[in-house]
Amino acid sequence: MNYLKPTIFLILCLVTFVYSQPSTLTIQGTIFDQHPDYNNNFEPKGGSIKKNLVLKTLGSSKVPTLVSLDPEDDTNEDGRMITPSLFQYFYQTSSKPLTKNSGANVPIPINLVLNYDSKKQVYVYNDQYFFPIDYQGFDVDSKYRTYNNGSGYHNFHFCLKLNTKFTYQGIEDFYFIGDDDVWVFINNKLVVDLGGLHSRETGSVDVTKLGLTKGSTYDFDFFYCERHTTASTIRIETNLQVFCPWYDYCGVCSGDGSTCCNKDTTCNDGKKCTIDACPPPKTVINKAGSKITDADIAPYCSHTDVSCPDPDLCNNNNCDASTGNCKTTPITCSNQDSKCLLAQTCDPKSGCIYKSKCTGVCDTGVCDGGDCVQKSNSTCANELGNNPCMVYSCGKNGCEAKPKCPQNPSTPCDVAYCDAGECKVQHLSASECNCGCDASDLCSKNNCVNNVCVPLPIDGIDDGNACTKDTCVNGNIFHTPINKCSGCMTCNPVSGNCDLSDTVCQDGNECTTNVCESSDSVLGVCTNSTVECGATNTDKCIQFSCNEATGCQQSAVVCPDVGSCLVGYCDSKQGCLTKPRSCDTGVFCLTGECIENAGGCIVYEKRCDADNGRCQQGVCVNNTATEEGYCKSEDYDPLPFICKTGAVVSTAVIAGVTVAGAVALGVFIYGGKRGYDYWKESRNVQFSGSNSNPLYEQNPNGSGVNPLYNDNSAL
């Protein structure tokens, strides 16, 4: 039967290759080229490993944060963080000026390709001579190529960031060895802590001990820095099936757009009063060619006006186009002629203060298109008592009243009188009207009582206004104002008392309350206070403002979002709150998630976990109009040897090899190498090494015999 062994070997290899794990796992990320001139945390004096440099929780920025920014902190000193404030630029793009310790760096996309080790069933990246960006970044310019390891130039100063995800299968672990700083976060928790300037150090994590939920998807974030000559090493071993959840418009996994967009060059609009910014990372950009260019990106850039908030209501703050700086200029309060308002001064809280020009004794205080509305006769009638036997008008001293039925002095015997507003005349006999009254007194009129002259004042002397002193001289009548009221007090024409008049105090600004007040020491003083709009309102979702022309206004409170993933909303009792942004896709096999650095919602294919991750693969079955989606487990075919209980390989097992393997063998035998190569390529078969076949391992169950295990004759 030995003649069958070569054939059996070939068939088993072919079948295993078809269903083996992918031979490589590519992890995409970003390298940030650093230089000691711009960040003195690179190339300091040598150090050693230092734990607890960074916080144990990864924030929404998805980069580590130092525990302390104090350069004299012992941990920072031991970890060779010479200038802790520059740590923020280890894993984030910085387009700072190329000046000493500015933090400037150059972002470069990178792919790490891990190869599958079938014996260990892990993916491995191993490079003990790890210089991935020689002649790139700053080192495009030869003046930066000043560091070497004794045998030649290399770029020794860079930081690597990988922001990925994985769906937990329940069997994962991670192993690392290398230098210098290495931090690994799973589910945003620090699980590998190899900080500091050190030679090769080892770190590992048994993911099954982290309390993760099988089938759930978690973040896997890896951070690595090379900060010192003369060596650079890295080795990763893991069975984590990490994947990239999203790409920026530069094509970088979880990127921020900085590898192909620079806000100062790509997005510069040439205006000093705008803040130029690259598009959000998930922006869909139409490319003119195969490679994205500045010209492609520029239309999607944002240019936000520089904000220059006004310091108060009496000053404007605007951006100076020549400098880009905010410049304050005072407001000019001008007369509002159409409103009959004369500008007086400016109050920082209320704005421009005005005085009405409609304050004359015959002004009503109302302005009509720039003209003061005068008191009408009816207005004066209402003001002075509205006696139907009087005629009312407004004169230079204000409202006045005259008899409706005046006496004619030339006919003293015909006495005029008014009866309920109707003029009548009573004719007197000679004895009643001619009793020796002095005709020379022009301010009196005849009046006889029992043939005795009892003169009466001529009509019109009393104007009915208690605020004037009425006199008659040689028949000339005078109404002199009684100026006994001070400040904003005015005389009441009916009672003659001084009343407080708020009208006098009006300043034409609807945002002030203007009141005439008196105290024991001061009479008639105008007080102006700022209107408190909404003072009694209890609804925290209504906001109030005041317009000096229209007064109090109300509007709904607009609660701002916090970042990209917290949506602002308003609660009438608590005010502004936030809630997580919903990214539900409605499709079972598509997962929606909000990522702060992505600028909002992302969507990626759901990865299903298998019941047994070593022997099965998880498959997602999408929902339909009538059925819900679900995950199912499918056995690997052929089943790996370690997954068979009490498996004994025999010719019967071999005879059960799939038809695909037999067909491949036939093509190989009868078609030669070229025919076989064509068959392989036409099916896009990915081959790993022959040692990926678990049938060449000893039976892990301890029973039965594997005839191909350690049998050199089979090879």
Curated annotation (Swiss-Prot):
It is found in: Membrane. Residues 115-256 form the PA14 domain. Residues 21-651 are extracellular. The lineage of its organism: Eukaryota, Amoebozoa, Evosea, Eumycetozoa, Dictyostelia. This is Protein psiH. Glycans are attached at N149, N377, N528, N622. Keywords: Glycoprotein, Membrane, Signal, Transmembrane, Transmembrane helix. InterPro entries: Fibro_Slime, PA14/GLEYA, PA14_dom, Prespore-cell_inducing_factor. It comes from the Eukaryota. It comes from Dictyostelium discoideum (Social amoeba). Residues 673-715 are cytoplasmic. The gene is psiH. It is a single-pass type I membrane protein. Residues 690-715 are annotated as: Disordered. Its main location: membrane. The keyword Transmembrane helix applies. Belongs to the prespore-cell-inducing factor family.
